[in-house]
Amino acid sequence: MEPQADIALIGLAVMGRNLILNMNDHGYTVVAYNRTLSRVDDFMADEAKGTQVIGARSIPEMIAHLKRPRRVMMLVKAGHPVDEFIEKLMPHLAPGDIIIDGGNSLYQDTIRRSKYVESRGLLYRAEE
């Protein structure tokens, strides 16, 4: 499979779905992923039908669709879920790839995560 997507977005609640569609409308190819796979299926069959959005059913599949440097945005519940996804993503990413936390994380958590992720050669950006 030839990587073709510009960014991946994890989290298909209302904000995630709408951000994916907005990026698609502006010419970006986005990979959509959610830990509840039925949300991916429903999104792809409904709002994303007929778009350039790519649905992924696993993290390795999601990463395989991305052009380098790979960009993964998370819109997941603040706290432990962010840490869980960082741990799930890191084995599949390489130095220079970017993890973006678009959620509402506590700034102390953002500082801790940034140091951790960047110590492994990845970039970490978050809303503050």
Regions found by a protein language model. Give the residues of each.
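Short glycine/serine/threonine-rich phosphate/pyrophosphate-binding segments
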Residues: R17-N18, P81-E84, Y107-I111
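Short, well-ordered coil/turn residues at beta-beta hairpins
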Residues: H65, L75-V76, G102
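NAD(P)+-binding Rossmann beta1-loop-alpha1 motif at the extreme N-terminus of oxidoreductases
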Residues: M1-R68, H92, G96, R125-E127
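The beta1-alpha1 cofactor-binding region of Rossmann-like NAD(H)/NADP(H)-dependent oxidoreductases
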Residues: L37, I59, G79, Y107-D109
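Glycine/threonine-rich flexible loop motifs
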Residues: R71-K88
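Rossmann-fold NAD(P)-binding glycine/threonine-rich loop
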Residues: E87, A94-I98, G102-E128
